[in-house]
Amino acid sequence: MYMDKKMDSGDIISQRSINIDDNMILDDLYYKLSILGRDLLIDTLPSILNGTNNRIKQNEEEVTYGLNITKEEELINFNDSVSNVHNKIRGLSSIPGAYAMLNNKRMKIYLSEKTNNISKEKPGTITDINKNIKTIN
């Protein structure tokens, strides 16, 4: 992005997109974006250096800003939808990590998997411990 006086408002130098599948975690996305960014830089740098790069004006209606994530936002609400819980966990893995409270201690949760298992337990109840992997319904 070309620099401008306002935050994140400059013209776009070049852009590419990537598909994010339903189970991709933050670390996987970071790696894929680093490769994509490297390739984009290699492809775009010559046009910047020789002055032929076509600036793309940003559509101000599509601009978004990333905000700092608070500890409260890291807390998993097991009464939320399965998709929202899963997306929070994978979006916050490995840093800062989503968490739940267990016996008044913060338990970081880095991975999740959606299943079709139906439980009669209250959401967030640990129902199985297998090889140090805790299953939470």
Located regions from the model:
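Generic alpha-helical secondary structure signal
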Residues: 34-35, 69, 82, 103
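Sequence-level motif detector for i,i+2 pairs with an aromatic at +2
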Residues: 9-10, 71-73, 104, 133
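Short, hydrophobic secondary-structure boundary micro-motifs
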Residues: 54-57, 77, 98
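Donor/substrate-binding cores of folate-linked one-carbon enzymes
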Residues: 1-65, 72
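Acyl-group handling in specialized metabolite and lipid biosynthesis
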Residues: 67-80
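Charge-rich, low-complexity amphipathic helices
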Residues: 51, 63, 67, 106-114
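A diffuse structural propensity rather than consistent per-protein peaks
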Residues: 25, 70, 124-127
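An anion-binding loop in the catalytic cleft
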Residues: 79-137
